From Swiss-Prot:
A Pfam match: TatD_DNase
A molecular function (GO) term: metal ion binding
Top enzyme class: hydrolase
One annotated Gene Ontology cellular component of this protein: nucleus
Family per record: Belongs to the metallo-dependent hydrolases superfamily. TatD-type hydrolase family.
Species of the source: Vairimorpha ceranae (strain BRL01)
Binding site for a divalent metal cation 2: E82, H116, H138
Entry's cofactor comment: Binds 2 divalent metal cations per subunit.
Protein name, UniProt field: Putative deoxyribonuclease TATDN1 homolog
Binding site for a divalent metal cation 1: E82, D186
Amino acid sequence: MIVDISCNITDSQFKNVEDTILKCKEAKVIPIFVGVDYTTSLKSCNYAEKFDTLFYAGIHPLYSENSVYIPVNSDRCIAIGECGLDYYRLQFSSIETQKRIFKVQLDLKAERYFLHCRDSHRDFMEILSDYNFKGVVHSFTGTVEESKEIIKKGLFIGINGCSLKNEEGIEVVKNLPLNSILVETDSPYCKIRKSYAGYKFVNNYQKHKSNEPYLIYEIIEAIANIKNIPINILLDTLLSNNINFYGERLVECFEKWRL
């Protein structure tokens, strides 16, 4: 089983959720659903319960201005998130508001966090210095040095199509320890495009306007080729990383999806 650690299943681009899940099962891909505010967290919860998978509940930094975090009480909620900082789009939420809402969520002292960091690395790491938890910085688009700081903090790094957009991203992947990597589509966004530096590392590219969880194999193929390792070695390591991060509740999902 492969885990897509980020699927925005509540996005309107998913016209037929049942069909998406069917494709996932055929491809042996388990998607984890992302909440970005209370409404999407609740919807992700409902989908996770319906399809025997997991979800995150949280407030995305871009929704910090008009959101109040309310925990969704469900054993399907595997982490708080998506939460963090995003300084690329400050028109949606100010820096101070983002920091405040981020800290509110960190103060919940959850076991795991699904984290967002865009153009905000220094403030992001400064805030995290006061906390210790399991976490993954998803959709990583930072530098090699930034990735090293994140790994030193004991966090995983999520790689998707946007992570492979330019040559800096390729260097990041080359330098990442295998035991620090988790993979994601962030569907329906972040598909590898033909203009991306990572495109040349995908042998079996599928042309789609929107991304889908079952296309996670493009990311896996690209990482294996960038790091020049056999794909089965990468798959085995990703399985170990996923179980290390998500624990027994993910293993339970594996059992149900194999039925």
